Curated annotation (Swiss-Prot):
Expressed in flower buds. PROSITE patterns: BRCA2_REPEAT. BRCA2 repeats lie at residues 63-97, 116-150, 163-197, 257-291. Disruption phenotype: No visible phenotype under normal growth conditions, but the double mutants brca2a and brca2b are sterile due to aberrant chromosome aggregates, chromosomal fragmentation and missegregation during meiosis. This is Protein BREAST CANCER SUSCEPTIBILITY 2 homolog B. The gene is BRCA2B. The keyword S-adenosyl-L-methionine does not apply.
Length: 1155
């Protein structure tokens, strides 16, 4: 490790810094020495201290024992005592000779040698405890990193920086230095394709250093000596290591022709050797990816940069907007190209200095320079972006990058990094596919932001040839063109932080908290200019900021250029991307200025705010990968049915040809509006009801809508929102049942909170699917089965009848199949007996064995070939027989109408709307019936009457009835019960089931459902009436016995189903006469006044139970027990007999009691 010492300057009034190392040499009076800095990526502590100094130490008198060398940021002197210097030397010192300042006025430092033979206090713990380091510990890593680089105190290979330390050009990730031998450098040169004279192009540079001496530096060498530089001290001997240095220099620059094989490592760590010949053939095959065709017609002896005069290298500055460090970036120079570097004094700050290259004499290379200028001009024309003229910004002050480029162009010099469009300040790409590989320069530039996210190392041999490839020593600063910064391939993939607003360091303030009122509450617009009032979402992308002091105008193109100069990637921040976001930002800020003029006062719609918004959006979308709601829907990452808040930005938006769609009538459903989430937009088609709301003025531009359960039309594959808005083929499908008005301050995008259910009373029958609603269950009807008979015919049966139909269907199928099989077997035998002409060997054997009396004896005498043919033929015969039989059976069943039945189970549920307890208005809840197709087992068993449920996935059906009819699929619908605590917030809605007796049947209104338990007096025969099969059942319950009225003791129940010719199943069996049966869900009809009896009829939802223990009829259990007790009484038998005779009399007069 090198150390820095203080020396008095020549005048004796000031001080200067110099480097001290292991190798001590005398100072040459005739030729001042120069020390070039190391290219190591991690500077030493001394380097860091030197970088912090921004100007020369001012000369001032100091007190004895104090050295006024450092100052604070405010310019205040910091007293530095000798004890502080001693403490610093104890930290920075190594096992080398370092100087000791005896007093502040000494001009020649006195050198003393530190004895480090046993211990070397180079490392310390976190608590400050010294960790001894012996030379034996150093020998171990040296043996691993390179046996030919053993360090001793007498013979040390000087590195390029001139420090007397090992040639540690590379460092590991933990800052451990890795020594590189000459053989390693030769392999690196063979890998990078360098020729023997690649480093000889700098021999023409003069060794003058007059400009550097002006700053008090005398320890720096010229480019000619950069590879063999040593630090010469006053106490050394001149020329002590000249022979050694010269030999090493020639060994590095002119290696032998026999280059050792280059070794690569695979991802698994396996070492592979590649010879120089193989690499040469690979380069010949792939071509030179860096130079292309620029040097095809240039003579090999031409030098691009051959200055003949004494030039000041420190005057060459290449500035790309970053702060220059105190390092000298060394670069390998080839015979065909040259890139100059700028040296900055450690005591000077050059972050804002612009210098020019004074090139007076150039070699014969003018033709080549013209080629480079032509290539750069073609690159600028390809970008086709003009220089920005921003409003509110200085148009006369050139950019730092432009100044550097202009200075370079003026001298006929264009940096090679700019020519090839690649950054020159980044390390070599990893070619081993290993993450633990150490590089010589593995740190990013100090002015670059750290890349966000994970980085991936990919072998450059697997990349396209257009990918950039550069050596670790290339440190060129990237130049900017006169119009737009050149963005290379590496810069496109980087994630440079443009905005510090995200992530937010403090809670964000939203418009409701900032403005505190609805936009329509303000009417004064005195502060809003006319051109701002005319801004709409349709023309916001064309808006430009005008500079009052000049005729410059700033629009979307200018902001694109600003983003690119800020470091944005043109791959992501494309022209379409910037124009789209510029449109929505301008429209939003203009709306703030228009609707809140008193508070905004025109300070929102400014260039600064627009640029900051663009940077913020780039940071979130590109660097952090955040996507808005519309972008996620179009990319397929989120369903369109998700709940989101969007804003109406335009009605009937423009199509591709710019024409406007005409307004549709009230019955039209293809009216489109443009919706935006603030970042992107897409079209949306309105249904019939929403179209009526639009025509009535209830939908307008600027209104926010809460959308849930929307559909997506025209979408097939992931699509960019910038392309979708142009094609206008993809649109959202909105319906009124899933579209609600949102609060004016609601945030756009997906909603994190749970959506509020739509009130059951607000559901429109033709308003599309209902995303979520809340209702109470009043009745759950039994499971029914619907069979589709073809030709749009179907029949609905109860569970009991369906079981009988299944049994009857299976019996008919079995009888038909048995008959077909018997006939088929006889037909097959007859056909086989007549097949005497079959010449196949297996068929002959089969026929012989079939007709033989003792086939076993014949088989015993057969040969192996005969048995094999017989077995094969028999297998074929059985398979053909089985296949033909199956086809015949299927055809016969199809002809007989006994094929597979298409039956779907379903259940009906009666719902009612809810009314809040806080509602003081009229309580008129709406009723509805939901049909669940293919209900799940959970829905069959867990749904309970009297509970409130949150339902999802219901679709209303068009109906003119006051009752709302909906349907749903069992697998797609969701039924979530509401908690009992929340259910208490609604008014009661449920009337529990209870048995009705004949004595109080008159209290029930007509067409109402009721349940009754009754004694079956008589079961009539089934008959057909107008395409329906009917059957009458007469029952009584004995409730009128105490009053002595016989006239009102009968109830006639009509069972009816659609007529079917093949159905011989009756509703009620005659065996039920004399039994007590429970009837549920009967409909009350008008009373038969002629025969003085009550009348009721059944529907598809009606059901009866013989067993009162059934769960569905449990409420009839007590009433059924009382009726059974009454029927067993002796007095009741006469009443039952009299009622039966009366029924027979009515039936005898006509076939129907209604006659």
């Amino acid at each position: 490790m090198s150390t820095w010492h203080l020396f008095s300057d020549s005048s004796g009034d000031g001080f200067r810094w110099e480097v001290a190392g292991r190798i001590l040499q005398s100072v040459s009076d005739s030729t001042p020495t120069k020390a070039l800095e190391s290219t190591a990526p991690l500077p030493s502590m001394a380097d860091l201290l030197l970088q912090g100094c921004s100007k020369l130490i001012e000369r001032e008198e100091s007190m004895p024992g104090e050295i006024p060398m450092f100052r604070t940021g405010l310019g205040k002197s910091v007293v530095l005592k000798e004890s502080s210097i001693a403490k610093a030397k104890s930290i920075l010192a190594e096992n080398v000779a370092y100087s000791d300042l005896q007093n502040t006025n000494c001009s020649i430092p006195q050198t003393r040698q530190v004895d480090t033979a046993e211990t070397m206090p180079m490392f310390r713990t976190a608590l400050g405890k010294t960790v001894p380091l012996k030379e034996s510990s150093i020998a171990k890593p040296l043996s691993i990193l390179g046996s030919d680089m053993i360090i001793d105190s007498d013979n040390v290979l000087p590195r390029e920086s001139g420090f007397g330390v090992p040639n540690s050009l590379f460092q590991t990730a933990s800052n451990k230095k890795v020594n590189v031998s000459s053989a390693g450098l030769a392999r690196a040169k063979a890998l990078l394709g360098l020729e023997e004279d690649d480093l000889n192009g700098f021999n023409h540079v003069n060794q003058s250093s007059s400009s550097l001496q002006q700053h008090g530096w005398s320890g720096l060498k010229t480019h000619e000596e950069f590879d063999a530089t040593v630090v010469k001290h006053h106490s050394g001997t001149p020329g002590q290591y000249e022979n050694y240095v010269s030999g090493k220099r020639s060994e590095i620059l002119n290696p032998s022709l026999k280059v050792p094989p280059t070794k690569f490592q695979t991802a698994g760590g396996k070492s592979l050797s590649v010879s120089a010949e193989a690499l040469k053939r690979a380069r010949n095959l792939l071509g030179d990816p860096e130079l292309g065709s620029f040097f095809d017609d240039v003579a090999g002896g031409d030098q691009f940069f051959t200055p003949q005069k004494d030039e000041r290298l420190s005057d060459i500055a290449i500035n790309n907007g970053s702060v220059n460090t105190g390092y000298i970036a060394h670069e390998e120079k080839t015979s065909n190209k040259h890139t100059s570097n700028s040296f900055v004094s450690p005591l000077h700050s050059s972050s804002k200095q612009f210098r020019s290259v004074n090139l007076e004499n150039l070699a014969s290379g003018g033709n080549l320079i013209k080629k480079f200028d032509t290539a750069v001009d073609e690159t600028n024309c390809a970008l086709n972006i003009s220089k920005p003229a921003t409003h509110g910004l200085s148009n006369n002050r050139p950019l730092a990058s432009d100044m550097a480029v202009n200075n370079s162009k003026g001298n006929g010099f264009i940096p090679r990094a700019r020519q090839l469009g690649r950054p020159a300040d980044q390390p070599l790409v990893d070619i081993t596919n290993r993450r633990d590989t150490a590089y010589a320069n593995n740190k990013q530039d100090s002015t670059q932001k750290k890349r966000l996210g994970k980085t991936v190392s990919v072998s450059p041999f697997k990349r396209p040839r257009i990918s950039s490839f550069k050596t670790p020593l290339k440190k060129n600063a990237q130049q900017a063109s006169s119009g737009l910064s050149v963005v290379s391939c590496d810069t496109l993939t980087s994630k440079k932080v443009l905005s510090t607003r995200y992530p937010e360091k403090s809670p964000r303030v939203y418009i409701k908290e900032f403005f505190g009122m609805h936009p329509t509450a303000t009417t004064r617009m005195d502060y809003v200019p006319d051109h701002v009032r005319r801004i709409k979402s349709s023309n916001a992308d064309k808006y430009v900021f005008c500079d009052e002091s000049s005729s410059n105008k700033v629009g979307a193109e200018t902001f694109l250029q600003m983003l690119a100069e800020s470091g944005a990637s043109l791959q992501h921040a494309s022209r379409k991307w910037v124009t789209n976001h510029y449109r929505w930002i301008v429209w939003k800020l203009a709306c703030y200025d228009i609707y809140y003029p008193a508070k905004c006062r025109g300070n929102f719609l400014t260039i600064t705010n627009v640029l900051e918004e663009l940077k913020y959006r780039y940071e979130r979308e590109v660097n952090h990968g955040h996507c808005s709601a519309i972008k996620r829907i179009l990319s397929g990452d989120a369903p369109a049915s998700s709940m989101m808040v969007l804003c109406i930005s335009a009605i009937n938006p423009r199509t591709d040809n710019g024409s406007q769609e005409a307004h549709c009538s009230d019955n039209c459903s293809n009216v489109k509006v443009e919706l935006t989430d603030g970042w992107y937009s897409m079209n949306a088609a309105l249904d019939v009801v929403l179209t009526k709301q639009l025509n009535a003025g209830k939908l307008f531009v600027g209104q926010k809508l809460r959308i849930l359960g929307a559909g997506l039309s025209g979408w097939a594959t992931p699509t960019s929102p910038l392309e979708a808005v142009i094609s206008s083929t993809i649109c959202l499908l909105l319906n009124i049942n899933g579209t609600y008005r949102a609060h004016w301050a609601d945030r756009l995008g997906f909603c994190k909170e749970i959506g509020v259910p739509l009130a059951f009373n607000c559901i429109k029958c033709n308003g599309g699917p209902v995303p979520k609603t809340l209702a109470g269950i009043t009745r759950i009807y039994p499971i029914l089965y619907k069979e589709r008979l073809g030709e749009k015919k179907s029949i609905v049966r109860s569970e009991r009848i369906e079981s009988r139909i299944i049994q009857l269907h299976n019996q008919r199928r079995s009888a038909l199949v048995e008959g077909i099989m018997c006939e088929y077997q006889r037909g097959i035998n007859g056909v086989h007996s007549q097949n005497d002409t079959d010449s196949e060997e297996g068929a002959k054997v089969f026929k012989l064995l079939e007709t033989a009396a003792e086939p076993e004896l014949l088989m015993a005498e057969m040969s192996l070939e005969q048995l094999t043919s017989f077995t094969t033929y028999k297998a074929k015969f059985e398979a053909a027989k089985q296949m033909q039989m199956e086809k015949s059976v299927a055809k016969a069943l199809e002809d007989a109408g006994l094929g597979e039945r298409n039956v779907t189970p379903f259940m009906r549920i009666r719902l009612v709307g809810l009314t809040s307890l806080s509602n003081e208005g009229e309580h008129n809840p709406k009723e509805g019936i939901v049909t669940i197709w293919d209900p799940t087992e959970r829905q069959r068993t867990e749904l309970t009457e009297g509970k409130i449920y949150i339902m999802k996935g219901l679709v209303p059906m068009n109906s003119d009835s006051e009752t709302l009819y909906l349907h749903a699929r069992g697998s797609s619908s969701r039924w979530q019960p509401l908690s009992p605590k929340d259910s208490e917030n609604f008014q009661p809605f449920f009337n529990p089931r209870k048995p009705i007796s004949l004595s109080n049947l008159g209290e029930i209104p007509l067409s109402s459902e009721f349940d009754i338990a009754a004694y079956v007096v008589y079961v009539g025969d089934a008959y057909t009436d107008v395409l329906q099969k009917k059957q009458w059942v007469f029952v009584t319950d004995g409730s009128t016995q105490h009053s002595g009225e016989i006239s009102n003791s009968l109830l006639a129940i009509s069972f009816s189903t659609p007529f079917m010719d093949d159905s011989s199943v009756s509703h009620i069996s005659h065996n039920l006469v004399g039994s007590v049966v429970g009837f549920c869900n009967l409909i009350k009809r008008a009373k038969d006044a002629t025969n003085e009896m009550w009348v009721a009829e059944t529907t598809e939802n009606s059901v009866y139970f013989i067993n009162a223990e059934a769960a569905y009829s449990s409420h009839l259990k007590t009433r059924s027990a009382h009726i059974q007790t009454w029927a067993k009484l002796y007095s009741s038998k006469s009443v039952i007999h009299e009622l039966r005779q009366r029924v027979l009399f009515i039936i005898g007069a006509c076939k129907s009691p209604s006659c």
